[in-house]
Swiss-Prot record:
One of its GO terms (biological process) is tRNA pseudouridine synthesis. GO terms for molecular function: RNA binding; tRNA pseudouridine(38-40) synthase activity. This is tRNA pseudouridine synthase A. Keywords: Isomerase, tRNA processing. The gene is truA. It catalyses: uridine(38/39/40) in tRNA = pseudouridine(38/39/40) in tRNA. Its EC number is 5.4.99.12.
Length: 263
């Protein structure tokens, strides 16, 4: 049978999602916990592989098993064997045609900036500290130029292995909440470092180092070296993955922290 999981994790202590030799990953911990509960080797497939330091409140995975357990037993059992920084939020049996990656129709990320002169001593791993006043309204205005179907070559990592840089962005919003600025973005799929590179570009605009029209130039030139720096990973969260309603997956609050779904 095929089972889907909703997973939340603090990425600060892991070398990314993907299992790797000699370093600790989220995938490794999850597969080891599942193997113990299922009493058979388990390998998982995720909706989106996150980099080292990147978090998730809405990661989705699936796996195959012959073990028969109620959903609640899976949830409680798996969490027993996971570290405190990883939590399974829901479990659901799914049809064989469900695929965590290929069935997904959209991914949604949120990037949290702590815009204050002094860094935070409490949320250091969960937000990115950027000092110097940021004009979030300029950032939002510039971000709207990214909505729609574009070639995002200027915002992909140099080592990105995607066959095409064309992606369709359904929305991107920039909103200030006191000392915090949140960038909320959704697209059908994302390139490697795409959200972090967009964030670095918007920060330069927010600092008024570049004009709003710079985004138009970057979309036209399709050159990663011309865009902003890659923002740090610690402010980035995968908060939701969208699937067809026919799969009827559970819907939980996206977060992270204090953020409402419709913030």
């Amino acid at each position: 049978m095929r089972i889907a999981l909703g997973v939340e994790y603090d990425g600060a202590r892991f070398h990314g999602w993907q299992r790797q030799n000699e370093v600790i990953s989220v995938q490794q911990h999850l597969e080891e916990a599942l193997t113990r509960i299922a009493n058979e080797p388990i390998r998982v497939v995720c909706a989106g592989r996150t980099d080292a330091g990147v978090h998730a409140t809405g990661q989705v995975v699936h796996f195959e098993t012959t073990s028969q357990r109620p959903d609640r037993a899976w949830t409680l059992g798996i969490n027993t064997y996971l570290p405190d920084t990883i939590s399974v939020r829901w479990v659901k049996a799914v049809p064989e045609d469900f695929h965590a990656r290929f069935s997904a129709t959209a991914r949604r990320y949120r990037y949290i900036i702590y815009n204050n002169t002094l860094r935070s001593g409490i949320l250091a791993n969960g937000v990115t500290h950027i000092y110097g006043d940021l004009d979030h309204e300029l950032m939002h205005e510039a971000a709207q130029k990214l909505v729609g179907k574009h070639d995002f070559s200027s915002f992909r990592a140099v080592n990105c292995q995607a066959k095409t840089a064309t992606r369709t962005m359904s929305h991107i919003r920039v909103k200030r909440m006191g000392d915090y600025i949140v960038i909320d973005v959704q697209a059908n799929a994302f390139l490697h470092h795409m959200v972090r590179n967009i964030t670095g570009t918007l920060v330069a605009i927010g600092h008024k180092e570049k004009p709003v029209e710079w985004v138009d130039e970057l979309l036209e030139v399709k050159d990663r070296t011309k865009a902003g720096i890659t923002a740090l990973p610690n402010g980035l969260y995968l908060v939701h993955v969208t699937y067809p309603e026919t799969f009827a997956l559970p819907k939980l609050k996206m977060g992270p922290l204090f953020l409402a779904d419709d913030f």
